[in-house]
Amino acid sequence: MQPNRVYFGEVVDPDTGKMLDRALLIPFRAPRSYTGEDIAELHCHGSPYLLRRVLDLVCRLGARLAQPGEFTMRAFLNGKIDLAQAEAVADLIRARSEAQLRSALALHTGALSQKAQSLSDALLSLLAT
């Protein structure tokens, strides 16, 4: 499979041969992923029963469920995002208003980090003179 391409296919239980769903699979290769690691996304329909069946199947086949915040932690540890951006992910998830959403997006896109870096550069320049 080529990374960063979308594949459409059937999710089939190998034990029964029965199709569970039609789904999209997107493989990502390090470092070109959110976490900076090899990863795959599986997109299937949203029925809670169906999702439970698909998750049970992929776990039986060797996958495991991620812990809350695990992908963001891995992205931070692998240098894909900085601490302000990592905290902004939690803010995005918790946003309950337009103002909260805009604030979290500004942090997530690196606006605060860029301003902090500019201030740091200016201070270092002053200290060097």
Feature map (PLM): residue ranges:
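A glycine-rich (often HGG/GG-containing) alpha/beta subdomain
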Residues: 1-102, 106, 110
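Conserved G1/Walker A P-loop phosphate-binding module
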Residues: 129
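An accessory alpha-helical subdomain
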Residues: 103-126
